[in-house]
Amino acid sequence: MRSFDEIKHLPQFPGIYGFKGPNDIKDNYSYIGLSNKLRERVSQHLLKRDSSVATGGSAISLNPDKIAECHWWIHESFSTREYLEAEELIAFERFNPTLFSRGSPSTKALDISNNEDFKKQMEKLFSNVPSGYIKFYDLSWAVNKIKQLENEILELKKVISDKEK
């Protein structure tokens, strides 16, 4: 079971987001989606678990307990729905996620996504570090962290003991 407390730090404005599983490498994403309100949509997937991709209503679905990270990208053009949809299409091409958003883009979004200048601009955005990210920790992470801290405490005790001699 993962802790999703960090969702409260997500911005509440338009953006493209990607979910990574614990074994996904650098540019691999399990799911890419878009939202007019990032925090609300990510909460719908991971906390409420009532999004179409998380309810298990199809053969392939999102398992919130397997999501280790959420990355997001923001851009000034994301406030326009057609541009947000176009950017999602470019993100699909760039990252080739395991699962895609189930929405159908508008004709205008398809046209925008085929504009070479726009495509280059979005490729640059998605090639750089995401605008933000959060990690969702699970019990195994906590156990490993405790072990690491115990080892550090033992090392510090040894240093103190050696200085007292």
Which residue ranges define each predicted feature?
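Boundary/linker segments flanking structured domains
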Residues: 1-14, 22-28, 36-165
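Conserved catalytic cores of phosphodiester-cleaving nucleases, focusing on short active-site segments
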Residues: 33
